[in-house]
Regions:
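Sensory/regulatory domains in signal-transduction proteins
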Residues: 44-115
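Feature targets compositionally biased, intrinsically disordered low-complexity regions
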Residues: 1-5, 14, 78-79, 89
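Short, low-complexity N-terminal regulatory "tails/caps" that precede and couple sensory modules
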Residues: 1-12, 106-110, 114-115
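Sensory modules in modular signal-transduction proteins
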Residues: 6-37, 41
Length: 115
């Protein structure tokens, strides 16, 4: 995957793989590569994780506990999906995680968080 770069206006899109409609979609979208390095966040994800700073280029395993990291590693190894609901600070969320592929091989993980 070439040339991931971040800009102040959050056009942190790798190639043309993320369509324009994802940028302002009313859910949080975070995408990482196969090593767990975050390569994309839409506007909602940037806002959701603002207190952690710019996450593009950081490893998502640094942001998860061991149990969650093990699930993510399994998804990356198997190309699988995972979905669950959580409640944090009285807010209910639905989380969907799925490996994404490039030329038939797992290239990373996409997480969609819906409130």
């Amino acid at each position: 995957m070439g040339g991931v770069s971040g800009t102040a206006d959050n056009t942190k899109i790798f190639g043309d793989m993320i369509p324009d409609w994802a940028k302002e979609l009313n859910c949080s979208i975070t995408v990482c590569d196969k090593d767990g390095v975050i390569v994309y966040q839409n506007d909602r994800a940037v806002e959701q994780y603002r207190k952690r700073g710019d996450l593009i280029g950081r490893n998502l395993f640094d942001c998860h506990n061991e149990k969650s990291a093990a699930i993510i590693r399994n998804l990356l190894a198997t190309g699988g999906t995972n979905s669950y609901t959580i409640e944090k600070n009285g807010v209910h969320k639905m989380i969907f995680q799925s490996a994404w592929k490039e030329n038939g091989f797992v290239a990373g993980l996409c997480e969609i968080s819906m409130i």
